[in-house]
């Protein structure tokens, strides 16, 4: 997930209008049952963009009813050929490609994401992911099993049913596609709750769902708050599975609610405090650049952020020097402004949390190399910050910061750094930089993380499974493994008169 250039960027639209602000159920737009709305803001200017209908339990109930009806045996969705499901997903990808400029602009304006990153990275990723999922629709298959006796046995990989999907604010459109793509490819129906900070692109995609020709009730989108709409999804007795991307704290609540209700299936992609280990024999320029983007991409608002950099003692000072030099190159500003290379944090809550953690680093004895405070008079901007001389017991070395703050630690031996890297509740991802293949394989095997990148960082594609160890979640998204999360395996055994080999 490295920053992109701007050479291929189309000119921003000057007349952007937000068309879709209502709840989407059964391919129709609805006001909230309560009549409530909530404001949506631009984090770069703190200005209100619009008011969106606020869904809660009553609206979730309506959406689940529609999704359940669409999933009934004999429904248009259940009787549709798998290849036709794939065709609908291809069509949706084409429509997103058609509206790519509009969606990227909206993502930047509502989420504080650099326009170049939104257009070149996020939208490109969404389109590729949908097409990948579309191709899988008619390739999800069971097996025949040669059991003992005069029987014919086979397995079916069936859709789970109604899936609740709760989307985070840091990658609103990407995570929406990660959720609905595999679910729909497998034949499920979905009830989606986008993050309250960033619901706009999901609601626009809802209009494209209808335009693509998905039957009513297959996709339903209910904007609202976590403690109301999100909790209603997690605890709903007629939702068969819930998938969530977000904080570990909220992930625990979702898993608890799933267990206390109907034991619905759960997939969680949660927080991280990912280690990045740089050995003395590494290509230093490459390591500095990947480690830098690993933590500063999207203002540090990434679950995979390389937020613990362990550098071998002999190259530590030079690594710090180059990292500080690189961090000082940022131009902060409105992410829609040409030339800006760092945008704002998503909201004041996150902004205050990041600044508090920066202050803790100063007080606990880390050396502030650059940054260390807010920027500007308006918007939630934080200076790119680098700390050296960080030790493992400091808050900035243990807690997920979710901001543009790099911690650089020193190590002497491989055994020591592996123990320190694994000494965390999290286990989402990790990086290793070395030119020694033996060390690369040894360290990669020892690290407790769902993804390990060697001599690179943040390479995430639709073909690869993604997910965490330990308290970074459970289950996998994307890749062939990701489709397993959206099917139930059924064994069917038929008595026959005679079995032949």
Curated annotation (Swiss-Prot):
Residue positions, PTM Phosphoserine: 413
Modified residues (Phosphothreonine): 337
Mediates interaction with PRMT3: annotated span: 336-501
EC number: 1.2.1.19, 1.2.1.28, 1.2.1.3, 1.2.1.36
Known pathway: Cofactor metabolism; retinol metabolism
PTM remark: The N-terminus is blocked most probably by acetylation.
Site feature Transition state stabilizer, where: 170
Stated pH dependence: Optimum pH is 9.0.
GO cellular component, one term: cytosol
GO biological process: cellular detoxification of aldehyde; fructosamine catabolic process; gamma-aminobutyric acid biosynthetic process; maintenance of lens transparency; retinoid metabolic process; retinol metabolic process
Subunit description: Homotetramer. Interacts with PRMT3; the interaction is direct, inhibits ALDH1A1 aldehyde dehydrogenase activity and is independent of the methyltransferase activity of PRMT3.
Cell compartments where the protein resides: Cytoplasm, Cytosol; Cell projection, Axon
Residue list for modification N-acetylserine: 2
Keyword set, alphabetical order: Acetylation, Cell projection, Cytoplasm, Lipid metabolism, NAD, Oxidoreductase, Phosphoprotein
Record gene name: ALDH1A1
Function: Cytosolic dehydrogenase that catalyzes the irreversible oxidation of a wide range of aldehydes to their corresponding carboxylic acid. Functions downstream of retinol dehydrogenases and catalyzes the oxidation of retinaldehyde into retinoic acid, the second step in the oxidation of retinol/vitamin A into retinoic acid. This pathway is crucial to control the levels of retinol and retinoic acid, two important molecules which excess can be teratogenic and cytotoxic.
Name of the featured protein: Aldehyde dehydrogenase 1A1
PANTHER family, sorted: ALDEHYDE DEHYDROGENASE-RELATED (PTHR11699)
InterPro entries the UniProt entry points to: Ald_DH/histidinol_DH, Ald_DH_C, Ald_DH_CS_CYS, Ald_DH_CS_GLU, Ald_DH_N, Aldehyde_DH_dom
Short name of any one Pfam family annotated for the protein: Aldedh
Residue numbers carrying N6-acetyllysine: 91, 128, 252, 353, 367, 410, 419, 495
GO MF annotations in UniProt: 3-deoxyglucosone dehydrogenase activity; acetaldehyde dehydrogenase (NAD+) activity; aminobutyraldehyde dehydrogenase (NAD+) activity; benzaldehyde dehydrogenase (NAD+) activity; retinal dehydrogenase activity
Main location: cytoplasm
TM helices/strands, residue ranges: none
